[in-house]
Amino acid sequence: MLGSSSGCESGWTLYLDQSVSSPSPSCFRDSNGFDSRRRSKDSWDQNYVHQEEEEEEDDLSMISDASSGPRNISEEDSVKKINIVGLKKQCKREKKRRDYEKMNSLLDDTASSPLFNFPHMLQKSVGGNKIEQTFPESTLDYSQGFSATQFQDKTAFQEQCGYLHMETRF
């Protein structure tokens, strides 16, 4: 794994792998267990200070390497996903509301429906031909007698447009 990294690893991971697998040159020991390089105290101090400065520079590069790794889900992406889920739920609620209102409008009182504006005729389509049927007067009397609405005289405008004015009694 030395010197190579896959797309998923950052420089920090690579650094940790290298530090474990390859010892630093100052750690080499001879067969007796002593450092193979003998140094004077001054050279040791200078070398130690120099190594410390390099480590600080390496530390900074390790931080930038680690932060420049592959991008996980960003905050913007997660917010977009949440918004999309919220919009889908809102659309479902709106559809349910519209369906409910539509169903309620279908359940309105049939005695006040536009069919009874023209009680003497009903056009029915059979095989592409319109057939006119008349209702018996008793049918209209029955529905009006048991309705909660009362029909009043229509104005000339209402007669032309086919509007029905109704009054509710309680």
Swiss-Prot record:
<dbReference type="GO" id="GO:0009691">
    <property type="term" value="P:cytokinin biosynthetic process"/>
</dbReference>
<feature type="compositionally biased region" description="Basic and acidic residues">
    <location>
        <begin position="35"/>
        <end position="44"/>
    </location>
</feature>
<feature type="short sequence motif" description="SOFL-A">
    <location>
        <begin position="10"/>
        <end position="15"/>
    </location>
</feature>
<comment type="function">
    <text>Involved in cytokinin-mediated development.</text>
</comment>
<dbReference type="GO" id="GO:0005737">
    <property type="term" value="C:cytoplasm"/>
</dbReference>
<keyword id="KW-0539">Nucleus</keyword>
<feature type="short sequence motif" description="Nuclear localization signal">
    <location>
        <begin position="79"/>
        <end position="86"/>
    </location>
</feature>
<dbReference type="GO" id="GO:0009690">
    <property type="term" value="P:cytokinin metabolic process"/>
</dbReference>
<keyword id="KW-0963">Cytoplasm</keyword>
<comment type="similarity">
    <text>Belongs to the SOFL plant protein family.</text>
</comment>
<protein>
    <recommendedName>
        <fullName>Protein SOB FIVE-LIKE 5</fullName>
    </recommendedName>
</protein>
<dbReference type="GO" id="GO:0005634">
    <property type="term" value="C:nucleus"/>
</dbReference>
<dbReference type="InterPro" id="IPR044670">
    <property type="entry name" value="SOFL"/>
</dbReference>
<keyword id="KW-0203">Cytokinin biosynthesis</keyword>
<feature type="region of interest" description="Disordered">
    <location>
        <begin position="17"/>
        <end position="78"/>
    </location>
</feature>
<feature type="short sequence motif" description="SOFL-B">
    <location>
        <begin position="61"/>
        <end position="70"/>
    </location>
</feature>
<dbReference type="GO" id="GO:0009736">
    <property type="term" value="P:cytokinin-activated signaling pathway"/>
</dbReference>
<keyword id="KW-0932">Cytokinin signaling pathway</keyword>
